[in-house]
Structure formats: C-alpha cells, structure tokens
Amino acid sequence: MTQTSSPLRVGVGGPVGSGKTALLEVLCKKMRNHFEIAVVTNDIYTKEDQRILTEAGALAAERIVGVETGGCPHTAIREDASMNLAAVEALSEKFGNLDVVFVESGGDNLSATFSPELADMTIYVIDVAEGEKIPRKGGPGITKSDLLVINKIDLAPYVGARLDVMESDTNRMRPEKPWTFANLKAGQGVDTIIDFIVTHGMLTPKA
C-alpha cells in the first residue's frame, strides 16, 4: 500500500535464543512481496542480528539497521528509545512507502516491555525449551504483549514439557489475549502470526 503516514511499528521481544531473529526472518520472507518492510535490530555491543538477517536474505541489506545499545538493552526499547526511534525515522525517510518496521529487542527477560512511543504492536516470543513453567511465571512480556508466540514446540518431548499444561497456563495468564504455538524452523504458526499483524495492524497488501 502507498503510505504517507508512519509505518506500523511492531516490537518483537523475548529471551535470548527464543527465536526472535528466526521469526523476523520468516516474517520478512513471507511478507516482503506484499508489503514494504524494514527491520531495526538491537544488540548490546555488536550488530550480530543485523548480520544474521542480511546473510539469510530476509530483506535487502539497506532495509536492515542494527542499533548497538551498549549497557542494558531494555533501556533502548523502553526508558530511552531515542536510538530506535531515530533508526525508524531514518528508514521511513529512505523508503517513503514503508508499511511495517519490525523492531527486535536485544536479549531480554520476562519483564522487558516496549515504550508505546516505539511500538504500535508487540509480539513476545518464548520457547518450550525453557520449560513448561514459563507461561505461569508471568511478567509483562507474557501478560501484556499483543501476541504471545510459544516457539519450538517440536522440542516438548525432549525437555519434558507438556503442551497442554502450557496451553492452560497461557490461557490463565492471558485471558482474552491471543497467542499461538509455533515451530518457526518448520514454518508452523507463521501464517497465524502474519494474519494477526495484518488484521490488527490494518495493513493492506499491495496488488
């Protein structure tokens, strides 16, 4: 769609290794033919996630910007989001018709949240390998994100996690809020996530 207003800003958070970068890769590859997309990644002292996404061919390199946050990565997405806001603005100016900018947080914990200034919508990724108790631990990422993604469900038998318990706990911690199981490596759950972004972000695919 041709857009004169600001792009939809989607914050993607979750603990280290949960699958944030993997999610961004599959979202970009499946959505890029229908929407104008860019990505901002956050790492403490490197631009590793930017490199991973670029080498994976998720988007053209100029559409992926890496922010080196230094110190605490939570601050860059919450208390002082200026570096990320500047990156989003620079991308918006460079590509005047952006529909979506994904902002990936640095590795964080269950208490990390995005500033409303920075993210219009938030997706939080956790994974089964952390154990079935993760949903019931709560925290803003679990309870307040717009969409919760429970990734790596294929590992459940190997780590002794019961998906029915995780489902029950998630429904209890997120009454009326959407969530989905996923195996991003195999593409499972990706269409559900895209449908959520498109519907709730009120995006119109280009012809």
Swiss-Prot record:
Mind telling me which SUPFAM superfamilies this protein's record contains? P-loop containing nucleoside triphosphate hydrolases (SSF52540)
Chief subcellular location equals cytoplasm
Is Nucleotide-binding set as a keyword in this record?
Answer: yes
Q: In the record, what terms sit under GO molecular function?
A: GTP binding; GTPase activity; nickel cation binding
Q: Where are the transmembrane segments?
A: none
> Which locations, inside or outside the cell, does it occupy?
Cytoplasm
Q: Name one GO cellular component term.
A: cytoplasm
> Which keywords appear in this protein's UniProt record, sorted alphabetically?
Chaperone, Cytoplasm, GTP-binding, Nickel insertion, Nucleotide-binding
GO biological processes: urea catabolic process
Q: Which residues bind GTP?
A: G14, P15, V16, G17, S18, G19, K20, T21
The cross-references to HAMAP family, in alphabetical order and at most eight, read: UreG
- Binding partners and assembly: Homodimer. UreD, UreF and UreG form a complex that acts as a GTP-hydrolysis-dependent molecular chaperone, activating the urease apoprotein by helping to assemble the nickel containing metallocenter of UreC. The UreE protein probably delivers the nickel.
Which PANTHER family does the record cross-reference, listed alphabetically?
UREASE ACCESSORY PROTEIN G
Family note: Belongs to the SIMIBI class G3E GTPase family. UreG subfamily.
Q: What does this protein do?
A: Facilitates the functional incorporation of the urease nickel metallocenter. This process requires GTP hydrolysis, probably effectuated by UreG.
What name has this protein been given in UniProt?
Answer: Urease accessory protein UreG
